[in-house]
Regions:
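Histidine-centered active-site/metal-ligand motif
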Residues: 1, 87, 162-164, 186, ...
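Single conserved hydrophobic/aromatic residue that forms the stacking wall/gate
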Residues: 1-12
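Histidine-acidic metal/acid-base catalytic patches
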Residues: 10-32, 36-50, 172-193, 197-284
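Acidic-and-aromatic substrate-binding clefts and catalytic sites of carbohydrate-active enzymes
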Residues: 23-26, 56-68, 90-106, 130-139, ...
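Catalytic domains of carbohydrate-active enzymes, especially glycoside hydrolases
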Residues: 36-59, 116-122
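Acidic (Asp/Glu)-rich catalytic clusters
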Residues: 43-48, 64-85, 108-120, 143-154, ...
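Active-site acidic/histidine proton-transfer and metal-coordination neighborhood
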Residues: 75, 82, 93-190, 262, ...
Length: 284
């Protein structure tokens, strides 16, 4: 219909984080090279709803949802979707933080980057890190992320960090999130702002756009349950300031549900497609 057609055309207009449908995916058996029909059907359902791309959340031992990078790309594209991005990370050990030598972890990242490139990814996003005990450890993490981002860029990908609420705590006397924004190189590290978690952390996304313009290439559009239902996230003001943020892509993520999962992700997309303040595309 006309409303849904706004989500089509540009191949990267509306992404969904596959963690949103984890309860379905977790029941799917993709092992031994056999593609469970439930998995294929789910991807096609998402495409039929009006989603145009996916963000993975299951990279492990060189595979995505037990599929090789090439097979995952093929499965997604066969369903009429595109592969945009993926959540994965490798946290530094106590020994690496103490020594400042994270070369072993960088070896892991080299393989990780190669696998994501083979899967057709544009972005790799680190979805989590613990709150460091010292500012020195946080500084080491920023240097680590800069190096990962540099290696991603050399392979034609971009590297970013996704927040929750704990990044708004202070490490010594510095707000962790602000310190990360100020000590990572914009050339190598972008930030995937999770709008809901910024609000839950008692902060204003728009204030961050104005303080650090252009750093937030992807929005994780999330709410307490279905997108737009709680009224606690000021989506109107957020999207009116999206240009300042520097956003290129929107990724819907639904972590909690008040209706069945498939209905929940569809209702959430409908909100984004119908909201007058959400542009049909942010891709440049």
């Amino acid at each position: 219909d006309l409303v849904r057609s706004r989500g089509l055309g540009d191949v990267y207009k509306r992404q969904i984080q596959l963690y949103s449908v984890r309860d379905i995916l977790n029941k799917v058996d993709n092992k031994n090279g056999k593609c469970d029909p439930t998995y294929t059907a789910l991807l096609k359902k998402l495409a039929n709803m009006g989603y145009t791309g996916v963000e993975a959340a299951n990279y492990n031992n060189g595979k995505f949802y037990d599929r090789t990078p090439q097979q995952f790309k093929k499965d997604v594209e066969s369903a009429g979707l595109k592969v945009l991005s993926s959540h994965c990370t490798r946290q530094l050990s106590k020994e690496e933080l103490a020594s400042g030598d994270y070369s072993k972890s960088l070896e892991w990242w080299d393989q990780c980057i190669a696998d994501h490139k083979a899967a057709g990814m544009k972005y790799i996003v680190a979805p989590w890190m613990d709150v460091p005990k010292t500012l020195k450890d946080l500084e080491t993490y920023c240097a680590y992320y800069n190096e990962i981002g540099k290696r991603c860029k050399q392979q034609g990908l971009s590297f970013g960090y996704h927040n929750h609420a704990h990044e708004f705590q202070k490490v010594e006397d510095k707000v962790m999130y602000d310190y990360m924004l100020e000590h990572t190189n914009p050339e190598y590290v972008f930030f995937q702002m999770d709008l809901y978690w910024v609000v839950r952390g008692q902060n204003s996304p728009v204030d961050y756009f104005n303080k650090y313009p252009g750093r937030f290439q992807i929005f994780h559009v999330k709410d307490h349950r279905e997108i737009g239902q709680s009224g606690m996230v000021g989506f109107d003001a957020i999207f009116k300031n999206a240009k300042t943020a520097g956003v290129n892509y929107l990724v819907a993520e639904i972590e909690g549900y008040s209706v069945p999962v498939e209905e929940s992700v569809e209702v959430s997309l409908d909100y984004l497609l119908n909201a007058p303040f959400v542009k049909s595309s942010y891709a440049k």
